Amino acid sequence: MGNPVDNKFTWVIKNFCSVSPKPIYSDQFLIGGNKWHILAYSKKRDGHQFLCLDLELVDCEFLPSEWRKVVKVSFTVVNFFSKKLSRQIGLKHCFNKKERSKGGSLFHLSELTDKKSGFLVDGEVEIVAQITVLETDRRFHVSKDYNMEMQCWDGMATTLVENKELNDDDKAGLVNVKGFQVLPSQLGIVNRIFEKHPETALECCTKNQELRASYINVIFSLIKLLYKGAQEHSTHDLSDAEGALAYMKNLGFKLDWLEKKLDEVKEIKKKCERVTEMEKELHDLMNKHTNVSKLLEKEKLEIKNASAPDLSFSDVI
């Protein structure tokens, strides 16, 4: 369904088994003053089938020939285990009568259809599109600057963390560590991970370097999350961490050391919660003690007053 307030459209594909090169279409939706729909299809690349998503302008034949609209769109394939594992791709494109659709590929279809991955649950796949109109100008002419600008996100944050495409200088500076291409800034922590836990990625069969880089980022995020102060962990954070660990284990990663840390953090969190409860109980008891003490003093005073000699009665006797 479409939401014109936040410019989002959610597409739930039911009875999803796989997609073919022939696209399937979402319902039409209205955002930014125009009707759109989403196309999902498969595309073969490097011997693998990838899921591709396109945003397509509907009824553009009725628009003026000089019509242009620059649009930024992001597609998110929702992970039902944890939002942090959701996959997102973003692009910017100048739509016109001739260029009515644009999109990109997200990840291997085999990973999408793997029931252990968290993307396919009860035969359903959920896709969220967010569309922002950046410019509308009939005098605007298409240029290379407004061809597609691809930006990929790795999904490791409650709000997805942007992972910008590497430029040539970045790629030239990449360092290979145990088959993972990492930036020099990541080298220290990656080396420490594999030195202390050499079994971590021995059974990871994925050869695609982009996917391997995203998996390393998942591990980074888990470390950052689990090594925070005990009081900084929310129940939601720990649930996400548990889902992320289960996902990584299904991919072949040996992360017993992180699972152990997660168990420790969960135990500490339970103790923190117990301490909070005990402090509240103590506070309530102290308040009750104060109230009872005041009531006791009042009762004693009333008894004392009631027991005092009645002079008028004594005079009579």
From Swiss-Prot:
InterPro entries: MATH-CC_domain_protein, MATH/TRAF_dom, TRAF-like. It comes from the Eukaryota. Gene3D superfamilies: Apoptosis, Tumor Necrosis Factor Receptor Associated Protein 2, Chain A. PROSITE patterns: MATH. Residues 254-305 form a coiled coil. Keywords: Coiled coil. CDD domains: MATH. Residues 6-131 form the MATH domain. The keyword Manganese does not apply. PANTHER family: TRAF-LIKE SUPERFAMILY PROTEIN (PTHR46236), UBIQUITIN-SPECIFIC PROTEASE FAMILY C19-RELATED PROTEIN (PTHR46236:SF9). This is MATH domain and coiled-coil domain-containing protein At3g58240. The lineage of its organism: Eukaryota, Viridiplantae, Streptophyta, Embryophyta, Tracheophyta.
